[in-house]
Amino acid sequence: WPEGSAMPAEPGLAAIPQVERTLGFYWSEVSTPEGGMSTSDVFYNERGVCIVSNSCMQSREDGSGQPGGISYNLRRAVAERAVSARDAIHILMELVDRWGYAPSGRAYTVADADEAFMIQIAQGRRYVAVRVPDDCVLIMPNHYTIHDPAAFDEFWMSDGLAGEAVRRG
């Protein structure tokens, strides 16, 4: 990519700087007669990293209310940059920490041949992520399912998330 390039972004959303070299990937998008659906993609890259997602509607009030943020490009950034599922989960957290998340909420699952992770993201800069244990099956419905991250051997959450949850009841 030429120096100073940005990843393609929808109008009004964060234009994420492109990295110099990207990985090849397969991309599948659900489409309607009107065209593709922005957040209905599945990516699988040349290093064997797959990312899928499902919407998670917020149960209380909306998040930060700040304009912009990242949406579609989270999947693409993982496809272009992640060399493992573990790398992918850190890329996701770094991008949300830096740019914020535009939609109301989403669950992403990233996996490779060795590991799988789920991250659930709310609007703004709020998320919780867990490594899926090797002897477990992951179910990704249209709502938040990580209620006790400490029940997992490996988990991460955004700064201030626990305090905000207590404050909101």
Residue positions per predicted region:
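A contiguous strand-loop segment
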Residues: 1-71, 91-169
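Second-shell loop/turn segments in exported
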Residues: 63-64, 74-82
